[in-house]
Amino acid sequence: MNTTITAKFYDEEFVPGTTNIFSSADDSSFDSSSSGRPVKKNKKGVILLPQPSDSPNDPLNWSGPRKMWHFFILSFITGLTAAVSNDAGAAQDSLNKIYGISYDSMNTGAGVLFLFIGWSCIFFAPASSLYGRRITYLICLLAGCLGSVWFALSRRTSDTIWSQAFVGMSEACAEAQVQQSLSDIFFQHQLGSVLTVYILATSVGSFLAPLIAHLISQSLTFRWVGWWGAIICGATLIVLYFGCEETVFDRSKYFPIYQSSRSVDHHVEENDKHEKNNDEKEAEKGHHNDEPLQVSPDETKGIFAPIEHESQASKELLLPYRKRIALITPSPYLEGFGFKQYLRRFVIYFKVFTLPAVWLSGLLWGLQDAYMTFFLTTQDTFFYDDPWNYTETGVAVMNVATLIGAVIGCYMSGVLSDKHVLWMAKRNDGVSEPEFRLWLLFITLLISPAGLIMFGVGADKVWPREAIYVGLAFIGFGWGSIGDTAMSYLMDSYPDIVIQGMVGVSIINNTLACVFTFVCSYWLDGSGTANTYIVLAVIDFVSIAFIIPALYWGKSWRRRTKRIYISLVELTQGMG
């Protein structure tokens, strides 16, 4: 099998994530595809990245309504799977009273939920470039149906724990696959705003699901929490199957490329086997792995040869409906059933944990999930008793304040961040850097820790209700702004390996959330609520402050990880 990859990756000046997003006086000075064709821009002169082809089957060329419909479905799936993952708490009291299932057991179920959310991602990710995006969504929604039915039928401790494994598996698609699909249909300069809606959908599912689930449990029975989850997941599965088109697209087919004489999967495998030997050889030549990859024309001769390609894309016909909604869309590079390719990808994808941007995004986003565990636990501990005396619905309504804060935070790190990036790029000779998105988090650096102190210390010391609700809004602001920035920063840094990067973030994020789920109650009991939240606020401040070294050395980190990035792009042919 011959493999293809665009030539830009082998340019010695290439740095992952660094892009020219504004036209210069000489447009020919920039052409990501080396095609010689005019660079495509929007009306404001922003260069469209990735460059769209002329094919009617290119998702970047879809009409506005077609994109919005697809975006709506993806956002609904995101909110739904987040809601199903956060509705079990509404049934805890009933399960404890009727069947004697302990709260600790249900806490264990929450830990299992987080583990399956994070680690399911890496099992689904390799299938994305081999079999298409749709199959993962369908499997995850089916898992959501099964998990919800199992939870609705719960009678034993094992039911409440292992039903959450399937529920967690269902949310895995929203942790990485959705971001990949969004990057398939939207341009890079739009991703901040697009991710605003994604984080909002996650926020609505996470913060309003407990309220809705409590209302269902009170008006019907606790079992209907599970039944309604299964019904909505099933209905969404049907809509998705018939209404959500495949977005995977072989972009290299429409642009001049370089062709390798050997299989890329084999190429990556051999690179792994001989990595140590290669390092020694490069050291003898005076090169180091942390230097930019340099490939001279002589070195590429015989290994890479230009392919002559006359674009016939504009003459292509739109694929028939049945092909656009096919259960599986095999990659043009698929070998047989792709089992060996799947296993190679599964192993190689762990390389993303060597990328600093993955760790920064994963830690920032993961800690926000951890804080949610703490404030939900504190709500259950304090606000049913004197002097608050809230009902279950009253406690659930408290999260509306958190949602309002999340909306504001998402707007700042999404819509305003996109404008901020364009403004900074203009001041930087049209060149955009992913680190531009981090500047707005200096606002969050102050607001988010303040929110933890206002809520946690306020609950313990019985501060006025206004302080409690403002604290929750500030926590929500941190959730929304950090979530949006973490996603967009990583997607900007390594735009051709979105799903691999998001898998790394999801594993870090949900593993952290799992750990904090188990230690939360013990920490609050051992240190006291006020002291615990003060420590959390310090952790929050320090973790967000990691953006400072990223602003200084982020580009250097991306340059040093160029080889790893290229190997991952080669592995998937740039198809995610």
Q: Where is each model-derived feature located?
A:
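Intrinsically disordered, low-complexity terminal tails of fungal membrane proteins
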Residues: 1-63, 247-345, 422-428, 561-576
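Extracytoplasmic
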Residues: 52, 66-103, 124, 174, ...
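Pair of pore-lining "gating" transmembrane helices in MFS-fold secondary transporters
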Residues: 67-86, 165-166, 354-372, 473-474
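C-terminal transmembrane bundle
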Residues: 82, 86, 94, 111-114, ...
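Loop-to-transmembrane helix entry/capping segments in MFS-fold secondary transporters
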Residues: 103-104, 188-198, 392, 496-505
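Cytoplasmic helix-loop-helix junction between adjacent transmembrane helices
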Residues: 165-201
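Glycine-rich segments within core transmembrane alpha-helices of 12-TM secondary carriers
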Residues: 190-218, 227-236, 240, 402-410, ...
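C-terminal membrane-cytosol helix-exit motif in multi-pass small-molecule transporters
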Residues: 233-256, 547-551
